[in-house]
């Protein structure tokens, strides 16, 4: 591994910016008959949010746990809460969510 100096760390920390992390979990209506259709529309909305530059990273979680997904938003906590409240999966009770303020490095991405 590359050795990272204290000076480098201090410099890099000045380059962070605020983001929000959303933890999406199974809601009370997870087993609803219309679940697949609603999740499909939830996914469509995620693509729209990605195209708008608001949802920077979206990661569905499929390990059988209550966690359904993780998203990193380029927006404030209040903006993200409003976005999530309008999500079709949240409105149908398929999902519930938590929003957490965070910081990260602009330009970071998932490897190809």
Q: What spans do the regions from the language model cover?
A:
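Conserved, structured core segments of small domains
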Residues: 1-112
């Amino acid at each position: 591994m590359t050795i990272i100096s204290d000076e480098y760390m201090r410099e890099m920390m000045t380059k962070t910016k605020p983001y929000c992390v959303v933890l999406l979990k199974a809601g009370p209506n997870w087993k609803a008959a219309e679940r697949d259709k609603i999740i499909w529309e939830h996914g469509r909305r995620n693509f729209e949010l990605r195209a708008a530059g608001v949802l920077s990273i979206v990661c569905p979680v499929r390990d059988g746990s209550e966690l359904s997904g993780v998203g990193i938003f380029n927006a404030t906590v209040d903006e993200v809460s409003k976005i999530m409240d309008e999500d079709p999966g949240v409105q149908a009770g398929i999902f519930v969510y938590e929003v957490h303020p965070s910081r990260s490095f602009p330009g970071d991405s998932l490897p190809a």
